[in-house]
């Protein structure tokens, strides 16, 4: 279920009211200046008073941030590489790449760069954790891009909240080589070692999880879900790595505060990045795309992301 916490509601309202105040006052000052020029009013206009000059500077910086967030940051993919060591592997290591929240739109955004980066990383496994499409016109471009990803040990995916809504009948990942996972585990073997990849499709109500617990504790297990909302239910020795997305890292974040909104039941607790919850490592990926319209078509201090995990024996 998609939720928004009271704290997020308050922070979003404060942010919007602050924007309204700054740009509302700026509009009034500019209108006063223009009317004064039209009427040839004598005297110094408030537009050039020192406090107003400071306001102009803030407004200009804000416009610059919005332009950067729309035209620049959504295209600056961050490759976040991590090494996880485990006693559950003896000889072989696995390179796993996670993508999420592609939100492919009418206009191409990051698809070509995603393919170039991922194939250059030479992963063993690629996993995708939901929300693939914003507009049906991008369906073939999405499929072509995902089909071109090379992963010799397999490509696996789970559904996101958008995938069970508008696009449920489209067969979004048909012909891409990705295998949907829903309440099942696939064992991937390399050399003499193996890891388990399991997944749970998104549900609009709280999904019962009894059938996805109890994984073998002597094997390294990766769990895929769209949101971080199940982490405190499934964390434990049977789930070594929990991979998700959904939050976009807030998509718009503020310095020293972080995400304004995550649409997770945990609010800002697991907004983006790496967390250790009990015996489980959680990674919340910021994703590659933007919320569908009328959501904001900007990213600010929350760059699109590809996550890379090198899962290695402790001895390496």
List where the protein language model places each region.
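Membrane-embedded segments
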Residues: 78, 88-181
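Short beta-strand/loop segments at the ligand-binding rim of alpha/beta enzyme cores
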Residues: 212-224
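Active-site metal-binding loops of divalent metal-dependent hydrolases
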Residues: 99-104, 130-132, 160-162, 184-185, ...
